[in-house]
Amino acid sequence: MLRTTIFAALLAFCVTSIMAQTQFAHTQGKEIVDGAGKPLLLRGTNLGNWLVPEGYMWHLNNGGPESPREIEALITELIGPQRTRDFWHSYRENYITQADIHLIKQCGFNSIRVPLHYKFFESDDAEGFTLLNRVVQWAGQENLYVILDMHAAPGGQTGSNIDDSDGYPWLFSDASAQEHTVAVWQRLARHYRDNSTVLGYDLLNEPIPNYPGLERFNASLEPFYKRLATAIRQVDKHHILILGGAQWDTNFAVFGPPFDNNVVYTFHRYHAPADQTTVQPYVDFRDRYNVPIWLGESGENADDWIAKFVAVLEKNDIGWAFWPYKKMQATTSVVSFPAPEGWDAIIQFSKQPRATSEGAARLKVRPEQPVIDGALAGILNNIPSSKCRENQGYIHVLLPSSTLPTESK
């Protein structure tokens, strides 16, 4: 009887352990599979411009602010520190809501990639967790997977506008930035370790650009990934680790054999030929190491190019997440929001030289305060999904079987 009881207890423990392990999406050879072991081809969109704003998605590029800190500086100049804090709080609360996640599901996507800025996850009770928890909860209700993407790491992994850095990828040579990044990722992993809606962790977005002299950091990339993996695995044994190549997530030559048994390799391709030549190097890598690959970003192109590239990806069983879900007044996103009245004046002002000595000249072309206030209020009014336009052509080339109506709003 005692043996039977012990055996039953051990069996229950083993079954529970197996269930705990397999409720999470994981890798199986060259495939990502769901908790039941069924192959999972990711079809997703990126929630860009939410926690990591980019100037071009506000039509502020071509001489205007591009990075989050530059956009924040512009708005602070226009409305002052306190109102700027209020603006961004409202922006983050309303840019991505439950209605957006529901629409993503309605379109036919099965996953979302969420670009993160480290500054929102500096403590367990930080604002970022409040915002991200809601998105993960809503995604779970819609049976969508969530990929967490470190888009802006401490010190900067690219040294460009997209990582909100000081203009140089200090992450690869600054010990304090590395320690900081490890701590942020371990905090995120500890927080989401038991959440199976979260599919995995995209450890660094587009590290090390192809700028002159920066290739010397390539040799540091995989060792730092190993360091991050060690820290994450101390608190989270379940989630997939997603590793991007050097030079904007294009160069897989930096990788040796996989160092973790639950890892996916991600590549990004923009404005490349929409044919087999673009994906073949990554397919070869997949075959060489028997690991899954995933396209974490692409897009910003004509609908016919996107249709051709999606066909190539799916022919090769490569999951994808196109960029982005939402931005201002554009057709190359799932939805777009209208530019508010007075925004052209803000754009023109944003392009004026910002040197201290140019202060008087800037004041001469500064819009009147009512115009400024109206334009920024218009941004907040226009970003909710109810005010956005669905780009039906874009949606239907990504997801030809989408059940959304083909006519535009």
Name each region found by the language model:
Residues 8-15:
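Bacterial N-terminal signal peptides
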Residues 1-4:
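Positively charged n-region of N-terminal signal peptides that target proteins for export
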Residues 24-25, 179-328, 332-350:
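Extracellular glycoside hydrolase catalytic/binding regions
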Residues 27-42, 47-240, 245-253:
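Active-site mouth of glycoside hydrolases
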Residues 18-22:
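Boundary at the C-terminal end of the N-terminal hydrophobic targeting segment
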Residues 305-409:
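Aromatic-rich peripheral "rim/lid" segments of glycoside hydrolase catalytic domains that contact
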